[in-house]
């Protein structure tokens, strides 16, 4: 049973949108983030969960994705305007921690061809994994474009050392109903990952990039 009150979520979404309309316009579309505080969890002892869920609507259309590809995938990536790197380019990073960290920071997510994904630990070391951005496998049987869209719609919940986290659940160019559906799905999925479900949730806030946080739980 979800303890999230639909009314509270709807109110938070409309107050975020109202706040945005009343303040001076930004030259970018603000993202709406779900901020989560947990309780009764010990990141040292309890299992640190990690899970991804595909939302009904893409929260960040401008999300930056990079294809770590074989020749065919690099060519396909070029056609759809997707940034890509081949094995030679990855070798040039020379496992340099700083460069790998910089690469992980530059993109929100990575995709990789089968022949490349196997070589990633050897080519890059643990950097992408540490950043929680280990690439998603793409086979030649799937459409690269639909894999990109699927990746843009997927959010990842990962518990690190601290008991709080944030995920993008929408943006201010979306309809309220779409944001609401994304929030519901994100929260229900997160709760399913928690050991004691709702008993581990301390608080939930919704917030746009530049706006104040709105508590929904």
Swiss-Prot record:
Keyword line: Ribonucleoprotein, Ribosomal protein
GO biological process: one example: translation
GO-annotated molecular function: RNA binding; structural constituent of ribosome
Organism: Arabidopsis thaliana (Mouse-ear cress)
Domain of life: Eukaryota
Summary of subunit composition and partner proteins: Interacts with the GTPase NUG2.
A GO cellular-component term linked to this record: nucleolus
Signal peptide: none
Family of the protein in this entry: Belongs to the universal ribosomal protein uL1 family.
Pfam family, one: Ribosomal_L1
Disulfide-bonded cysteines: none
The keyword Signal is annotated on this UniProt entry: no
Name of the protein in question: Large ribosomal subunit protein uL1x
């Amino acid at each position: 049973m979800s303890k999230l009150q639909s009314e509270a979520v709807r109110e938070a979404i409309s107050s975020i949108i109202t706040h945005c309309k009343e303040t001076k316009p930004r030259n970018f579309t603000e993202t709406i983030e779900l901020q989560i505080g947990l309780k009764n969890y010990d990141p040292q002892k309890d299992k640190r969960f990690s899970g991804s869920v595909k939302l009904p609507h893409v929260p960040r259309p401008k999300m930056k994705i990079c294809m770590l590809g074989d020749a065919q995938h690099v060519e396909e990536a070029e056609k759809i305007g997707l940034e890509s790197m081949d094995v030679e380019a990855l070798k040039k990073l020379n496992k340099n921690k700083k460069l790998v960290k910089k690469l992980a920071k530059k993109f929100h997510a990575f995709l990789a061809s089968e022949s490349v994904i196997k070589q990633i630990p050897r080519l890059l070391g643990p950097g992408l994994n540490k950043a929680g951005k280990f690439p998603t496998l793409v086979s030649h049987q799937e459409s690269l474009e639909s894999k990109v869209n699927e990746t843009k719609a997927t959010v990842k919940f990962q518990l690190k050392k601290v008991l709080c986290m944030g995920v993008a659940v929408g943006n201010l160019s979306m309809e309220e109903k779409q944001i609401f559906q994304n929030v519901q799905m994100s929260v229900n999925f997160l709760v399913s990952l928690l050991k004691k479900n709702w008993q581990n949730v301390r608080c939930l806030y919704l917030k746009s990039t530049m706006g104040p946080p709105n508590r929904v739980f």
